[in-house]
Regions:
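Short, flexible catalytic-loop segment of classical short-chain dehydrogenase/reductase
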Residues: 41, 62-73
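Hydrophobic alpha-helix immediately C-terminal to the catalytic Tyr-X-X-X-Lys motif of short-chain
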Residues: 39, 43-47, 51, 61, ...
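Active-site helix of classical SDR
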Residues: 11, 36, 44
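Alpha-helical segment proximal to the catalytic Tyr-Lys
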Residues: 4, 49-53, 112
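Residue(s) in the substrate-gating loop at a strand-loop-helix junction
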Residues: 20
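Active-site loop-to-helix junction immediately N-terminal to the catalytic Tyr of the SDR YXXXK motif
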Residues: 26-34, 46, 70-71
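Active-site loop immediately N-terminal to the catalytic Tyr-X3-Lys motif
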Residues: 25-31, 53, 91, 109
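C-terminal substrate-recognition "lid" of short-chain dehydrogenase/reductases
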Residues: 57, 92-121, 126
Length: 128
């Protein structure tokens, strides 16, 4: 509905999808999750091509494990937490505040030439 209204009213702007680092890599026992995130990456790229001529940019923010109520049950498992942090070259889990900069950037005119892109906020996980 938002896109329809933007197109109907000739409103230019920025759509920011949220994916995951797992939309760029695979992982054991995460087939469904990774597949859904790969789908968001493809959706973002397709919409960027489709909506770009109308001045609508579409990008994705792809975080690593962020400490939230959703990830809390996984991170209570000390072995899982240790293994996860071991995959992140910066050596720490993400915090919600780590995502603020990328979202503000993508929503602003500072990213006016970006569309169909992903910003990985993963502490280096996907650099491996």
């Amino acid at each position: 509905n938002v896109v329809k209204k933007m197109l109907h009213n000739n409103i230019k702007g920025s759509i920011i999808n949220v994916s995951s680092q797992m939309g760029h890599v695979g992982g054991p026992n995460r087939t469904t999750y990774c597949s859904s995130k790969f789908a968001i990456e493809g959706f973002t790229k397709s919409l960027a091509i489709e909506l770009g001529p109308n001045g609508i940019r579409v990008n994705t923010v792809c975080p690593t494990f962020i400490q939230t109520p959703m990830t809390e049950p996984f991170l209570k498992d000390e072995e899982f937490k240790k293994t996860t942090i071991g995959m992140i070259p910066l050596g720490r889990l993400g915090e919600v505040k780590d995502l603020m900069g990328p979202f503000v950037f993508l929503a602003s005119e500072a990213s006016s030439l970006m569309t169909g892109s992903s910003i990985l906020v993963d502490g280096g996980w996907t650099a491996r």
